[in-house]
Amino acid sequence: QSSAQEHSQLPVGTPVNLRKLLAETLELQTVASRKDVATLARYTDCPHSAPALKALAEDDYKAQVQQKRVSVLELLERFPACDLPFGVFLELMPLLTPRYYSISSSPLQSPERCAITVGVVSDPALSGNGTFEGVCSNFLAQSPEGATIHASLRDTSDGFRLPEDPSVPIIMVGPGTGIAPFRGFLQERAALKDSGKAIGEAILFFGCRHPDQDFVYRDELEGYAKDGIADLHVAFSRQEQSKVYVQDKLREERDAVWALLENGAKIFICGDGSRMEPDVR
C-alpha cells in the first residue's frame, strides 16, 4: 500500500498477475541509483556481499553501475544474499514510461491508417551480463498480426513540420529509423503533387549499413526519386572498407544543399543527435 501511494498507477485493491505487474508497469532495466544500491546494501547481512554493495553505492558507482547501466534487478541477481522485501523493490522501481515514435506516413495518402518505423533493440548489455532488449520495440515485434496496440497521439513541435507552402524546398537528414518522419513528408508531397499542386525541391540524405540488409523502404524511396519528389542520397557505412555516413554525403552535395538553403529551404534532422548532428552541422 505504501508503494502504491507513490506509484499511483500501480493496480491497488485487486488481484494482479505478478508477471503482468513486472512486465507491464515497471521499468526493470532502469539504471540503479546510488540510493537504490545503498538500499540493497542495508538489506544484506552477508559479510561478503554487504561491503561489495556499499562500495558500489560509493566510489565504484560511476564506473561499475552507472556507465555499465546496471539495474536493481541485475544487482539482485548478482547478490542473492540481499533479502530485499518485494514492497521495497516496488518502491525502488520507476513506472514504465511511454515510448515515442514518429509517424512515418501521411494522412493525405492513408487518412484512416498511420505507420511507425521501429528498430528492434537487442544488443549485448553494457554490463557484460546478458542482452539488453528494448521494451517497446520487442513488444511490437512479438505482437501477432491483427493485435490491438494501445497508443496515444502527441502533437509534434512546430519546428518539425512541413512548411505550409509546399513550394518551399526541404532538406532531410535521417540515418536508420530517423527516416520515419521523412517517409511521411515524402508521402505528403507526393499526394500534393498528384493533386496538381506545385512542390518545391527536396533532398533526402539517408544512412544505413548495407543496401542488402537495412535499406528500409528502398523501393518506395527510389520511386520518389524517380518521380521527382526528392533527390535521394544514401550512405552505406558497412558496404565497403571505407565507412560512409550521411555527413559525408552532405559534404559531397554541399553545392546543391547551399543552393537550396539560399532559396529558403528548411532543413530537418532526425536520428542520433549526440553523434550525428554535430558532424552534420
Features from the language model and the residues they span:
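FNR-like FAD-binding dehydrogenase module
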Residues: 1-281
